[in-house]
């Protein structure tokens, strides 16, 4: 009985440790609000090629992000989408704070093509431009955000 309990406790600790690592890979850097991090990751009127554009994000994350989408629009335009009817988020069905854009926007989707890269300076991406609708999760602004926008985008849920 004791060895089983001990083994179970070790398995639980390993599982919790892995969940913590996975969570930290998706966490925003602490110096940014959720809206600021959203803007860094997903807003660019004229993004350069993906390999260059992703360097900024990867430098904060200390690893190669598997994929990312840059919306070629302004932060203010995405904030306006937050005023659209609330819908259930498509990727996280437990959230009801998502909003779908009414218009397609130009975008650039980046896919990591060398997932085994050991150094973030070696991350390479394939560029996939497109024009799609998008769904964003929105929340009340953080105190550090500009009071100009009471509700701000905090997560790009999907593109359609």
Curated annotation (Swiss-Prot):
It holds the Pfam family RnaseA. Its EC number is 3.1.27.-. Disulfide bonds join 50-110, 64-123, 82-138, 89-98. Residues 28-72 are annotated as: Required for nearly all of the bactericidal activities. Its main location: secreted. Substrate binds at residues 65-69. Belongs to the pancreatic ribonuclease family. This is Eosinophil cationic protein. The gene is RNASE3.
């Amino acid at each position: 009985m004791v060895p089983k309990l001990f083994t179970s406790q070790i398995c639980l600790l390993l599982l919790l440790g892995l969940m913590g690592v996975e969570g930290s890979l998706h966490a925003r850097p602490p110096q940014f609000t959720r809206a600021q991090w959203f803007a860094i990751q997903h807003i660019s009127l004229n993004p350069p090629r993906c390999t260059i554009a992703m360097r900024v994000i990867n430098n904060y994350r200390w690893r190669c992000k598997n994929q990312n989408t840059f919306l070629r629009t302004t932060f203010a335009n995405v904030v306006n989408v937050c005023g659209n009817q609330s819908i259930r988020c498509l990727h996280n069905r437990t959230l009801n704070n998502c909003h779908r854009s009414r218009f397609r926007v130009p975008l650039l989707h980046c896919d990591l093509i060398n997932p085994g890269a050991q150094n973030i300076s070696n991350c390479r991406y394939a560029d996939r431009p497109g024009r799609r609708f998008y769904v964003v999760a929105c929340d009340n602004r953080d105190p550090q955000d500009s009071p100009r926008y009471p509700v701000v985008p905090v997560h790009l849920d999907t593109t359609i």
